[in-house]
Amino acid sequence: MAVFPNSCLAGCLLIFILLQLPKLDSAPFDVIGPQEPILAVVGEDAELPCRLSPNVSAKGMELRWFREKVSPAVFVSREGQEQEGEEMAEYRGRVSLVEDHIAEGSVAVRIQEVKASDDGEYRCFFRQDENYEEAIVHLKVAALGSDPHISMKVQESGEIQLECTSVGWYPEPQVQWRTHRGEEFPSMSESRNPDEEGLFTVRASVIIRDSSMKNVSCCIRNLLLGQEKEVEVSIPASFFPRLTPWMVAVAVILVVLGLLTIGSIFFTWRLYKERSRQRRNEFSSKEKLLEELKWKRATLHAVDVTLDPDTAHPHLFLYEDSKSVRLEDSRQKLPEKPERFDSWPCVMGREAFTSGRHYWEVEVGDRTDWAIGVCRENVMKKGFDPMTPENGFWAVELYGNGYWALTPLRTPLPLAGPPRRVGVFLDYESGDIFFYNMTDGSHIYTFSKASFSGPLRPFFCLWSCGKKPLTICPVTDGLEGVMVVADAKDISKEIPLSPMGEDSASGDIETLHSKLIPLQPSQGVP
């Protein structure tokens, strides 16, 4: 009878241990990357390793290497299969997974035929169930250029110009000139210009006036590789002419004539520049008037846009009027719906457009990251599908201190100033979507001749949390007190426009040469 309690205790202990086993499989882990940057030479292969701590198997985990954004990524593997559709075009077909030690939690991504554009920071991301971690891997790309070549040119003044040229360097190399005694001296001018592959072509020139410098060498160094290439040239003594009194007299006369010529050219140039400036200012004023006419006519097609809560990502909080939205760290408990975004922090407008022209404005304020535009009603809302026109998105964004049009290769937008309010104009029949900076009325970007099929809806996205929301502006903000000036040269000819977009009595021909201006400064389009 004394043995029974011990047997019961042992059985209970065994059951407790077995219950803990499933928890061990999904235990938390850390991802560790290399402490030092990975150095790779252009044209060769590079491996970006990461490992798990503790050393548990990475089989079956989601493995992702990416750069600035999670998607599209450099490499994605899910359940042991590469997901090429989620990879960046410039890496597709050049990356593979090195999984020799995957059972010990050590894996790497191999990049074949490294390019200069591959240089920079990468992140490796491991996910298993609800547990995920990431680490940073730095890749340093280097290329040793061609042997330098020195060309020699004797100038009319008797000075000798040497130009040292070499191609195929990365990153930008250092150029140094030396005398035959090993004394270093700087270049008179240098240029380092990248080619289509991102490799630098180096040109450096010097002027030699001292006839004792018979041998001169040009040395180009790659500081990252710690290697250099050098070439030496000998300057014949006959290249240094001897000065005579008559040569000095001729030189003085030439200098005087040169100064007189320069003075005459200078005054002629100033007169030409002044006249050119006047013509340019007149042309610029007309161009600005026409550009203002485009977006102010767009406001005549203004629509009242509101946010659709059924499409909002759980981290997006909509205001009661459905006009403003902000991103929060906390996740709301919302019903799962097929029309709700579950990965990208986005929300659609309630309004769906299948024809006609439509215009609305969004107050972005001083927020540092957002995306605004139009999307098809049936776009993929689950997962990280790239936001491109091919996938049904036509949008512009502010991300990483830069403005971009979300084309397949992301088009940079060189704006004169940051817009605090953005206007969006959709012309369904022509397939055009225009974006305007309503701070100064300038044009931002246009998606032209798009092929629309089915309903289109306004689209909004936030990339970071913040107290300041993204706000859809009321329709009346841009329509009060708008006037048309029939002739840009005569501002006294003002013709009012109907807020509903009806042309005035002057007709369409007169409107083509009109400028929309606010009746009062406080009533214009912001």
UniProtKB/Swiss-Prot annotation:
Residues 1-26 form the signal peptide. Residues 285-479 form the B30.2/SPRY domain. Gene3D superfamilies: 2.60.120.920, Immunoglobulins. The keyword Signal applies. Residues 27-140, 148-234 form the Ig-like V-type domain. GO terms for molecular function: signaling receptor binding. Seems to associate with xanthine dehydrogenase/oxidase. Keywords: Disulfide bond, Glycoprotein, Immunoglobulin domain, Membrane, Repeat, Signal, Transmembrane, Transmembrane helix. May function in the secretion of milk-fat droplets. May act as a specific membrane-associated receptor for the association of cytoplasmic droplets with the apical plasma membrane. Inhibits the proliferation of CD4 and CD8 T-cells activated by anti-CD3 antibodies, T-cell metabolism and IL2 and IFNG secretion. Residues 270-526 are cytoplasmic. The chain crosses the membrane at residues 243-269. Belongs to the immunoglobulin superfamily. BTN/MOG family. Residues 27-242 are extracellular. Disulfide bonds join 50-124, 164-218. One of its GO terms (biological process) is regulation of cytokine production. This is Butyrophilin subfamily 1 member A1. Expressed in mammary tissue.
